[in-house]
């Protein structure tokens, strides 16, 4: 019988290849090893200060281009033989992680530890031909040296190092010799290690790092001095005009400190995100991160320093799945909301300035945050036919035009492309109308009206046939215009226009011949068509969606002709069998499409273009066609 027992064996590992693989592919930038080695030095000093709290820690970096070497020195705790064998000679082992667990268990200062010594030091092999570690631990009679050239073989022996601490000597490969330039080193230290709590010098000059940020100060002489300190810090760091500063103090299960600010940057792209530089225990992990701030905080930038976010293995990103990420993101959102709500109540002039810069994004915040909505909704700005206007001002001005005791109408339209025609309609009737064409705006107006039921009523102009705007005709006028309605419907249908129901109303201004009003069905059709264009669907779903679209297209769109318009009155009087008159009827429809940009699809645009060319050609060919036309020349089958 054949044995079915599985074969067992150990996987073989190419240690030299593994070290190089980790070094070269874990880190995106070659100079990241400077950050890692400075982190190691800082953590070593933190460990020594547990027993010597008054120790003045220092970190020195020296470059020697002639020998292609970089030296990193610190006066930290140092290592003995056991530490070296455990943390330097075992791939994947981290002395800092072990010490952090010990300090946490003892209630110690684990929050000050930054890196992962055994893992982070491997980053040196991104650029190194060889790494030498010389170290002497506090209380030990002698030091040790460890050599490695990026292979499984390493050397460990006694060393005559006199001072306590560690020195790491990196022999830089020729193709990375540019990293030995002092200006480059200083730039790297400032970028990554600006807030390390110990001074870092480069070639004897320094400190290069700032050491402290405003949130590291234990006390300020006054609130004004604190605010000025934060603003000065941000002004030196960012080129933006700062509209307001938001100090961050998050405590509790997860902690974070830092400074956010509201920028003057214009944000036309709805996909723009607010960005922060993320520091973990004072060390830069990610610059310009666009994931930590809430999605609606698009106009906010700043710096966040936290001990609780978990860096990835390469320490160039944070783990978004860790519970700390969602918690800190939520608390940062709370800080932003609380600050803006405070400004709205106590510093309205500053809030109005921010509002004018970022009214769209503030409305997004109000949509997501109930408390923020309640506190600022009256101050939110909307575009109207009289310029930008807060809801409070709109309601006050509209109420002055409303009969006492009746609900104040809040007129709006939901498609920005229709602004021109509805602004003209509103101006002619001395009405205020809101352009609620951006995301959230219509929903916010509905929410606002719901809060003020009985006092305010919503009137959507682009989806209603309101008699207050579109006056009804008398019975005799209806009969007079009925044939024009039928003739125009028939000609539009034969011309390939989507199904349109023509109705005659009387509205102002008189020089506006026609407007198109959306029905709920035609609005749904347009949204469905837009999504079909944007989405890649499976064949089955695509067929189903397009069938639904075809069904919806059978529902007509309303074209309202203006009974007071001279051109419409001329069409009423002319013989509509005349080819030129028919082209004019089509032109009236196209003019309404052009006034409502949201309805101008590619197919509509092509039809408008073709009609214009055709009309121009007819005029050039025979400018007297209308005058010479005789009914007996041709018989046309018109509707009705």
Model region roles, listed by residue range:
Residues 1-182, 187, 194, 632-640:
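GHKL (Bergerat-fold) ATPase N-terminal catalytic module, capturing the glycine-rich phosphate-binding loop
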